[in-house]
UniProtKB/Swiss-Prot annotation:
GO terms for molecular function: ATP binding; ATP hydrolysis activity; ATP-dependent protein folding chaperone; ubiquitin protein ligase binding; unfolded protein binding. Keywords: Acetylation, ATP-binding, Chaperone, Cytoplasm, Cytoskeleton, Hydrolase, Magnesium, Metal-binding, Nucleotide-binding, Phosphoprotein. This is T-complex protein 1 subunit alpha. CDD domains: TCP1_alpha. Disulfide bonds: none annotated. The modification Phosphotyrosine is found at residue 181. ATP binds at residues 37, 89-91. Its EC number is 3.6.1.-. It catalyses: ATP + H2O = ADP + phosphate + H(+). Transmembrane segments: none annotated.
Length: 556
């Protein structure tokens, strides 16, 4: 009779692995929990080479953690997904997912099958999304620009720039509106990547500025070049303009010394011909990711053109998109000849080198294909500037989402409290096992208002109880349905009408975080077996070099 199948590794199954996964998820959530809300605290992360990052952003914290546990990795990837999809709500999505898992584990311990819990969670998530879209949405058209500013301020309130929320909120809204364009379907689009953010340490936060145009952190290649060009025709090149040298390994046998001079002359002429082809199309601004040597700069100075070298590839792509230029990595065409055509040029009203703050920058203004904007951030040190950039990115994404979806929901725990009451009542109408799972889903959502209150040093039990009472009244009594806008005022420690207070979040942030958190919790909940293989050991006859020396294997 054959023995049991042996697996070359560790295997844990059933309740043990489920408890491990829940603990791993809870420990990840506990790391970011204290950073949630307008009075959340920051984290300092030091990597293996000593680089320091100080941040409040959930996605950044989890990205910099080196997590080994596979279930914990799921939550780290979840925060990253929320950051890419929506741009905000990364901390809350992880906290909700961990709480859903914890409560699901309690149910499983009470002998309720994970499949029943999973179907209950899916049903609860679907109902929650439907309830938000039918009852909690505020249309932005009735609120106008103030709504955008308030949504940006809500996003910034927990960040380092929250203290200057009014100043930065206006800057962010202006920047997003400046890069608006209409796509082929006639839909307005707001590409956040078109807003270039530059950082310069020194001065205070409020000396940051918004510039109309794309700001390049470069200067012209030579002092003899013009510093301002009107009606610019821009060539975007992804190669160096330097004297052509023959590749290593190429051997040329010469009998006549004059031939050597001819070869050197031809090397110079190849680059000169390329530059002449570019200038012949009317190009007067040349941007390249590579270098430009002195010989080539001379031709540009004589032609009165502006040449900029060592432009970042990222910046070059954005400028090409904004101006309508083509990025060329070579001038060679399909026939093997080198050509450059006028259609490859981008256009802008003006390209100018200006001194802004303490540095010289090149500004590309009023580009032809799309408009662009740049924000120059000032701060006390590099850590502060980096965190300001992350905060602004979140705020830009929030404003973009509000403009595209044209709807917001009240913040400050209002949505979670309303959903919790609704789902509890909904659970009692279910006559199946899913009832318990839906009730636990409802209880899990209260982790957000609870955490907000705890981080603000308030009595969370008292505050959340009051909040639930208001929302219960709003849902039971149709005459008092305006109470559904009630959320937490964390500074004064009492419930308030967050619609009047202007605490708004994009609807998509709430909807996506609910969906993502539910899916992540379900993914981890389905796991009931973990097999961890042992690392493979190489069958080396002599082992290391030292062992080989001692064994005499190297003597032959």
């Amino acid at each position: 009779m054959e023995g049991p199948l042996s697996v070359f590794g560790d295997r844990s199954t059933g309740e043990a692995i489920r408890s491990q996964n829940v603990m791993a998820a809870a420990s990840i959530a506990n790391i970011v929990k204290s950073s949630l809300g307008p009075v959340g605290l920051d984290k300092m992360l030091v990597d293996d080479i000593g680089d320091v990052t100080i941040t409040n952003d959930g996605a950044t914290i989890l990205k910099l953690l080196e997590v080994e546990h596979p279930a914990a990795k799921v939550l780290c990837e979840l925060a990253d997904l929320q950051d890419k999809e929506v741009g905000d709500g990364t901390t809350s999505v992880v906290i909700i997912a961990a709480e859903l898992l914890k409560n699901a584990d309690e149910l499983v311990k009470q002998k309720i099958h994970p499949t029943s819990v999973i179907s209950g969670y899916r049903l609860a998530c679907k109902e929650a999304v439907r309830y938000i879209s039918e009852n909690l949405i505020i249309n932005t058209d009735e609120l106008g620009r103030d709504c955008l500013i308030n949504a940006a301020k809500t996003s910034m309130s927990s960040k380092i720039i929250g203290i200057n929320g009014d100043f930065f909120a206006n800057m962010v809204v202006d920047a997003v509106l400046a890069v608006k364009y209409t796509d082929l379907r006639g839909q307005p689009r707001y590409p956040v990547n078109s807003v270039n953010i530059l950082k310069a340490h020194g001065r205070s936060q409020v000396e940051s500025m918004l510039i109309n145009g794309y700001a390049l952190n470069c200067v012209v290649g030579s002092q003899g070049m013009p510093k301002r060009i009107v009606n610019a025709k821009i060539a975007c090149l992804d190669f160096s303009l330097q004297k052509t040298k023959m590749k290593l390994g190429v051997q040329v046998v010469i009998t006549d010394p004059e031939k050597l001079d001819q070869i050197r002359q031809r090397e110079s002429d190849i680059t000169k011909e390329r530059i002449e082809k570019i200038l012949a199309t009317g190009a007067n601004v040349i941007l390249t990711t590579g270098g430009i040597d002195d010989m080539c700069l001379k031709y540009f100075v004589e032609a009165g053109a502006m040449a900029v070298r060592r432009v970042l590839k990222r910046d070059l792509k954005r400028i090409a998109k904004a101006s309508g230029a083509s990025i060329l990595s070579t001038l060679a065409n399909l026939e093997g000849e080198e050509t450059f055509e006028a259609t490859m040029l981008g256009q802008a009203e003006e390209v100018v080198q200006e001194r802004i703050c303490d540095d010289e920058l090149i500004l590309i203004k009023n580009t032809k294909a799309r408009t662009s904007a740049s924000i120059i951030l000032r701060g006390a040190n590099d850590f502060m500037c980096d965190e300001m950039e992350r905060s602004l990115h979140d705020a830009l994404c929030v404003v973009k989402r509000v403009l595209e979806s044209k709807s917001v929901v009240p913040g400050g725990g209002a949505v979670e409290a309303a959903l919790s009451i609704y789902l509890e009542n909904y659970a009692t109408s279910m006559g199946s096992r899913e009832q318990l799972a839906i009730a636990e889903f409802a209880r899990s959502l209260l982790v957000i208002p609870n955490t907000l209150a705890v981080n603000a040093a308030q009595d969370s039990t008292d505050l959340v109880a009051k909040l639930r009472a208001f929302h219960n009244e709003a849902q039971v009594n149709p005459e008092r349905k305006n109470l559904k806008w009630i959320g937490l005022d964390l500074i004064n420690g009492k419930p308030r009408d967050n619609k009047q207070a202007g605490v708004f979040e994009p609807t998509i942030v709430k909807v996506k975080s609910l969906k993502f958190a539910t899916e992540a919790a379900i993914t981890i909940l389905r796991i009931d077996d973990l097999i961890k293989l042992h690392p493979e050991t190489k069958d080396d006859k002599h082992g290391s070099y030292e062992n080989a020396v001692h064994s005499g294997a190297l003597d032959d």
